[in-house]
Amino acid sequence: MRWISRPGWPGHLLALAAGALTPLALAPFDYWPLAILSIALLYLGLRGLPGKSALWRGWWYGFGAFGAGTSWIYVSIHDYGAASVPLASLLMLGFTAGVAFFFALPAWLWARCLRRDNAPLGDALAFAALWLALELFRSWFLTGFPWLYAGYSQLQGPLAGLVPVGGVWLSSFVIALSAALLVNLPRLFPHGASLLLGLVLLLGPWAAGLYLKGHAWTHSAGEPLRVVAIQGNIAQELKWDPNQVRAQLDLYRDLSLPQQDVDLIVWPETAVPILQDMASGYLGAMGQVADEKNAALITGVPVRERLTDGKSRYFNGITVVGEGAGTYLKQKLVPFGEYVPLQDLLRGLIAFFDLPMSDFARGPADQPLLKAKGYEIAPYICYEVVYPEFAAALAAQSQVLLTVSNDTWFGTSIGPLQHLQMAQMRALESGRWMIRATNNGVTGLIDPYGRIVRQIPQFQQGILRGEVIPMQGLTPYLQYRVWPLAGLAGVLLLWALLGRQLRPQERRLFG
């Protein structure tokens, strides 16, 4: 098995296969032990490699992970971006090759500066710290791409109890640490004290996760809210067709009018497919309907801001009418879907760079939350719910979470189910109920433990009825966010860096 840790194609191909295991640990497959196996194979494959070989080993791992785990991007480019099969394949390969460097560069850094082959415990801790740093970096760099985090595999796994303590980040850290420790255990057997400490580090977090699973970190802030969520199941090719606007508005109105004994009526992202000011009469009428029901209606709608120079800016928004108030403008935009980077160069080249409603501006930071039925509601539009720190900042001010989305862009791929899993993790991290309304699925209600308690199947028109309980109190993660864990990771990485620079006789302090 030494070939695994040697330069060359056999090890690279194994890294490719190991990376491709990543999505199998996540929704919709949920074979969570594969997350540990995948990372363990990468860790083993990097052992002893020089920097350049480690860089390519990490790149092949990343290519496998993103190639398999974000294959739904091809659906968006080909099916809805009108790109030919060769062009869509080329763009998908280019994207995958680029994001694979998220793993390549840390692998190079690991080999050149941090790896300590003669200190199995310290090496495992430093590797887990580097893995956490990688996931944090991915959530920030170039607006972020926080997809395929290892920690999502533990949504309902043994580590779920740790998620309210340290978020998905803590789950990822423990998985990476466990993977490295399992690889290094045989090297610890001759050393009793080190073996004992290694077993504590390996088993302790899993035992703590099981012990805390189901612990109630938050409590009720009032009576349950009766919720109706509408899933319109509008085909994407009809979504922005001007001839279909009236039919869509009528559909959501007609599905909502009969609803009685309701507090919140929720429509999906851009359920109103025209600008808010153009739909003012319609929204005003629906607000009156909501008032008559003693309810609030919350819907996605694009928003126009007229500027003093005669130009306008456009936002992806959510607004409340009836017994509530507020309009929220989306802050985390999807590249190419909601805005086009370098648009002066790319606009007009292919249809994918000219999708409908792909010229949104970013909403301002520090917007007030939505208000409905006397409660503060944290809003997330589509992609925003996948950012743990961003979501936590809003959740800490709220009693209920709300996310609206249109995952029609991803067809029947695994993308919408991965997206749903990340939304569930936000509910678990915050200890709050979440309402999720989507155009074609999955619309559902999620409890504070990340469990779906009501849902409408994908690709069906439907009406979901249920209750959510406003919650108060802060989980440890909402209180302290990722900072304690990031600080620990920083100390571990500095420890590894210093330990590597010392002479052999001085390394015992850092071993």
UniProtKB/Swiss-Prot annotation:
Keywords: Acyltransferase, Cell inner membrane, Cell membrane, Membrane, Transferase, Transmembrane, Transmembrane helix. It holds the Pfam family CN_hydrolase. The keyword Nucleotide-binding does not apply. It is found in: Cell inner membrane. Its main location: membrane. CDD domains: ALP_N-acyl_transferase (cd07571). Gene3D superfamilies: Carbon-nitrogen hydrolase. The active site is at 269 (proton acceptor), 330, 382 (nucleophile). InterPro entries: Apolipo_AcylTrfase (IPR004563), C-N_Hydrolase (IPR003010), C-N_Hydrolase_sf (IPR036526), LNT_N (IPR045378). Disulfide bonds: none annotated. GO terms for molecular function: N-acyltransferase activity. The chain crosses the membrane at residues 7-29, 58-78, 90-110, 125-145, 163-183, 192-212, 482-502. GO terms for cellular component: plasma membrane. PANTHER family: APOLIPOPROTEIN N-ACYLTRANSFERASE. Belongs to the CN hydrolase family. Apolipoprotein N-acyltransferase subfamily. Catalyzes the phospholipid dependent N-acylation of the N-terminal cysteine of apolipoprotein, the last step in lipoprotein maturation. This is Apolipoprotein N-acyltransferase. It comes from Pseudomonas aeruginosa (strain LESB58). The gene is lnt.
